């Protein structure tokens, strides 16, 4: 009798644990991620440019650099997934310039996760971000 109760107790604990883990995964996967994007292309582009320029300006030994780079990585994903499929936006010169800068930076973050952004890449991306910001403010 005791063996049967122990077996049932073990099964109940396993089932409860599996249920809790499943619900946790379901709720976190379906939750709306907090994003700084507003849906306004001009505002979002300027905000992303400023955020990325701030992240790029951090020294290699800055406290919180990895967190900033991780947030930049997520921001790039959010921005591109929002605006790449929109034909009214992705034909603009500001978007293509922005896309070039973001692809370069994202490529570095994906390939060299724990390494600082090289100076030449930093300068090129910063220049392209500046061009994209000027173009979007002009309306092109």
List each language-model region with its residue ranges.
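Alpha-helical segments in soluble extracytoplasmic regions
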Residues: 37-91
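Bacterial signal peptide processing site
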Residues: 31-34
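Short, charged, amphipathic alpha-helical segments
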Residues: 66-73, 92-100, 119-130
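Bacterial N-terminal signal peptides that target proteins for export
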Residues: 3-19
């Amino acid at each position: 009798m005791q063996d049967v109760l122990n077996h049932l107790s073990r099964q109940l604990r396993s089932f409860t644990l599996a249920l809790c883990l499943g619900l946790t995964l379901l709720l976190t996967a379906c939750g709306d991620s907090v994003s700084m994007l507003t849906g306004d292309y001009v505002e979002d582009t300027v905000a992303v440019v400023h955020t990325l320029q701030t992240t790029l300006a951090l020294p290699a030994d800055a406290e919180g650099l990895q967190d900033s780079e991780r947030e930049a990585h997520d921001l790039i994903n959010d921005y591109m997934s929002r605006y790449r499929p929109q034909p009214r936006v992705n034909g603009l010169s500001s978007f293509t310039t922005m896309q070039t800068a973001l692809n370069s930076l994202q490529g570095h973050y994906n390939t060299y996760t724990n390494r600082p952004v090289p100076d030449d890449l930093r300068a090129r991306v910063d220049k392209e971000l500046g061009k994209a910001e000027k173009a979007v403010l002009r309306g092109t």
